[in-house]
A protein has these predicted regions:
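Generic alpha-helical hydrophobic packing signal
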Residues: 116-117, 146
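Generic structural detector for well-ordered beta-strands
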Residues: 83, 103, 134-136, 147
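Catalytic core of carbohydrate-active enzymes
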Residues: 1-111, 117-118, 141
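Extracellular/luminal ectodomains and secreted, surface-exposed scaffolds of diverse proteins
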Residues: 117-141
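Surface-exposed interaction regions enriched in Ser/Thr/Asp/Glu
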Residues: 136-152
Length: 152
């Protein structure tokens, strides 16, 4: 371990949404998101949420001018399923489409297949040295179901 690196401890089954670094709220676009999921064989279900609004409105909660994303995972020996949905009225400047990069940590083998809303994903990256699986989904304001089948 290098002295200039700080270890990060994450709870098994945690969802960690992240955006690119930004200096001010005015430069936040919201059209790109990284969603990290920390898989673990001891976890068969997990949930996470993310709140998003325009960063300006003082009464966004009272007027439901926000999106509240819900992330749910369920796993067994053969599959990992991740569901993404949102509620709230949204806000005027919210993007119509978000590019979400899903990064699954502690993934030890290349998957047999990945289905996004029953469509086989043609592109994904499995990083053997880091034990991560990553791929992109487009969020178009409707629920997304992801099903990853493991090799046996």
């Amino acid at each position: 371990n290098k002295l200039n690196e700080i270890p990060v401890f994450v709870k098994a089954g945690a969802f960690v949404p992240m955006i690119a670094s930004t200096n001010t709220i005015s430069s936040y676009k919201g059209d790109a998101l990284k969603l990290h999921y920390y898989a673990d064989s001891s976890i068969d279900s997990a949930r996470g949420i993310m709140y998003d609004d325009d960063g300006i409105s003082m009464n966004a909660i009272e007027t439901s001018a926000y999106e509240l994303f819900s992330f749910e995972a369920s796993a067994n020996k053969q599959t990992l399923a991740i569901d993404i949905s949102a509620k709230g009225k949204g806000y005027r400047s919210q993007p119509a489409k978000r590019k979400i990069k899903i990064i699954i940590h502690n993934w030890s083998k290349q998957p047999k297949n990945i289905k996004i809303d029953d469509q086989t994903a043609s592109q994904f990256t499995w990083n053997e040295s880091q034990n991560t699986l990553s791929f992109f989904v487009d969020w178009l304001q409707h629920p997304i179901n992801i099903k990853i089948t493991k090799h046996e």
